[in-house]
């Protein structure tokens, strides 16, 4: 994947990010290129070695086909999940870390439904908020709209599916 300054990409754990610059740094006498990513949510800048960008999960924003798949995932029936809180939390954490937008959508769907049915622990509420933030950021970019509209779209899809 070729990265250019000004491209918008998705970075796992943080969501949408803008490539602000491509820097060359010398580490242990070796010149390496780094992508300087400005995360859309919050005031965070991340530097990722260009060689490892795909390995750590930096990818393009989903297109219309990918968006349709995300909506299918959000509408899909509830998946079987571990009843043990710590196992469920760990499984969801792994899905978020994968950087796969469909796995993030699964986390949002499952935690949202669990919240509607039984409520969530404080840790799972934070995880749901983080997963929603990542998904809303990507939906906003894919739909070419703002976060508020993307959040409305997400809420409508979730409500219609339940």
From Swiss-Prot:
SMART domains xref list: CarD_TRCF
Induction: Induced by DNA damage and starvation.
GO annotation, biological process: rRNA transcription
Knockout or disruption consequences: Essential for growth, it cannot be disrupted.
Top-level taxon of the source organism: Bacteria
Effect of substituting residue 47 to E: Weakens interaction with RpoB, increases rifampicin sensitivity, but does not affect growth rate
InterPro entries (UniProt xref): CarD-like/TRCF_RID (IPR003711), CarD-like/TRCF_RID_sf (IPR036101), CarD-like_C (IPR042215), CarD-like_regulator (IPR052531), CarD_C (IPR048792)
UniProt xrefs under Pfam families: CarD_C (PF21095), CarD_TRCF_RID (PF02559)
Function noted in UniProt: Controls rRNA transcription by binding to the RNA polymerase (RNAP). Required for the stringent response to starvation, oxidative and genotoxic stresses as well as control of rRNA under normal growth conditions.
Protein family: Belongs to the CarD family.
PANTHER family linked: RNA POLYMERASE-BINDING TRANSCRIPTION FACTOR CARD (PTHR38447:SF1), TRANSCRIPTION FACTOR YDEB-RELATED (PTHR38447)
Subunit structure: Interacts directly with the N-terminus of the RNA polymerase subunit beta (RpoB).
Protein name (database record): RNA polymerase-binding transcription factor CarD
Source organism of the structure: Mycolicibacterium smegmatis (strain ATCC 700084 / mc(2)155)
